[in-house]
A protein has these predicted regions:
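Membrane-interface segments of envelope glycosyltransferases acting on lipid-linked substrates or membrane lipids
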Residues: 1-262
């Protein structure tokens, strides 16, 4: 199970609700990538009784771990000085990602620290709308559109803060990647609490004003010293090399026991 529901997408929700019971008709074993998804698809009773195997959305930590020399190289490549505050976002330009609110947050950040920049990676149907908003706020020189990228793991190195004020999420992999890169993460509290793997992550309400989000970002970044978080991420079961071994063991166990978990 990767699925959850969102009240804003009623058509998708209806389809999911119709199909959900069929997920268990022929399944002999249940698996999920988060508690939220597991409970939604298989039910609280199945989850609480241990019938659902939880396997985290693990990543290749070696690709994402903090690297100071790569950070400097990437910033130089992007034409960003070492002392510039960089706020980053990775996601499609769709309503869910709440880019309009993100721009309002950055506008408040920039008022208080004009040596700041916002990097936006991704494509999507609302890109032009966001570009127009940036022009209206006269932030053209301080917001950059990076397009669809194949070097996302390196982009995280250039960030100081990862901001994700989504209207809704399940457990976003970008949140896991950002924490693996050792950067501060400011996320909306609309997503599952499991997204907070490390203490460098903070949830904020979308009811807070953009200025309150900005103040939180500026206060937190002053106090934070970036470190390599790969060991801690491994201990939290987000190292894909270790999780792959667990999955292999899980499958072998099923095979050796006729499909039953032992």
């Amino acid at each position: 199970s990767h699925s959850t529901t969102n009240k804003k997408e009623w058509k998708k929700n209806l389809l999911k609700q119709v199909l959900r019971p069929f997920s268990k008709v022929y399944a002999t074993n249940y698996m999920c990538c988060s508690e939220l998804a597991g409970r939604w698809l298989f039910g609280d009773k199945a989850y609480d009784s241990g019938q659902v195997y939880l396997l985290n959305n693990a990543i290749d930590l070696d690709k994402f771990k903090y690297n100071e020399s790569l950070r400097k190289k990437k910033r130089k490549e992007l034409g960003i000085s070492d002392d510039t505050l960089v706020i980053g976002h990775i996601g499609r330009f769709v309503a869910q990602k709440n880019h309009t609110f993100l721009i309002d947050i950055f506008n408040e950040v920039h008022k208080k620290n004009n040596n700041s920049i916002l990097l936006l990676a991704g494509q999507g149907p609302l890109k032009e709308e966001i570009e127009n908003k940036i022009k209206e706020l006269k932030l053209n020189d301080s917001v950059r559109f990076l397009g669809q990228r194949s070097d996302v793991n390196e982009l995280y190195q250039a960030f100081d803060v990862f901001c994700l004020p989504s209207l809704y999420e399940g457990l976003p992999v970008v949140g896991v990647e950002a924490q693996a890169s050792g950067i501060l993460c400011i996320l909306s509290n609309t997503m599952t609490k499991e997204t907070k793997v490390l203490d460098i992550t903070k949830f904020m309400s979308l009811n807070n004003t953009p200025e309150e989000w900005a103040d939180s970002i500026l206060d937190d970044v002053k106090r934070y010293k970036r470190i390599d978080t790969s060991k801690e991420m491994t201990s939290k079961n987000f190292n894909i090399k270790e999780e792959a071994k667990k999955l292999e063991k899980y499958y072998l166990n099923l095979y050796n026991n006729g499909g039953e978990e032992k």
